[in-house]
Amino acid sequence: PVTGEWQTYTFKLSDLAGAGLDVSAIDVLMIFPAWGAGEGAVYRVDNVKIYNPNAAPVASGELNVFTDTVADQWSIWDCCGGSTPTTETDDDQHGAVAQFSIGATPTVMGFLADEGVSFDASALIENGVVQFDLKVITAPSNVDAQWLFKIESIGASSAVELALTQSNEGQTPVTGEWQTYTFPIGQLFDAGLDISAINVLMVFPTWDMGNGALYRIDNVIIANP
């Protein structure tokens, strides 16, 4: 460091892992002079991030939650079932997709933003949509289970839950077939969602009726179509 000048510093996660760091559970980052030799130091730090510099940029005002891979600062998520959703290879059109499997423990699944992270869709209220592709590989064993879409704002301060049949397409999932589902941002806002702080998107069978369900999701966007 040169006193009075900003300098960028970059460390590869692969190098840190090679040095012994568990990169799956990072919870502290520190920058400091040598122990016992820092008296008098005054310094500033900015633009601290853990990210993929090669990730495709997201268009301004829009969010690609999942296409081939999950967005930075988002994850594929199982609320309560204890499973780890995976990324699997599907057909040529879809490529890598998110896969979810529900067992006997009641749960909901989808995509979750990191702590304190959310997406502001306010600029999309007129024409924007939440859209995704769904393919059910194995239907739930309970034939009365209904497929649902749920979206929440940060801190679960507001949420909207709708049947997939309430989408623009109005289609019930057909096992083994991909189907696109579209929900207008304006519709979600009118239903009570705080669209300025979206941080959870979920697709799942009715609570406690999902045992046996195996399904895939791709092309999850919050955007102007």
Language-model region placement:
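Beta-rich carbohydrate-recognition modules and glycan-binding surfaces
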Residues: 1-225
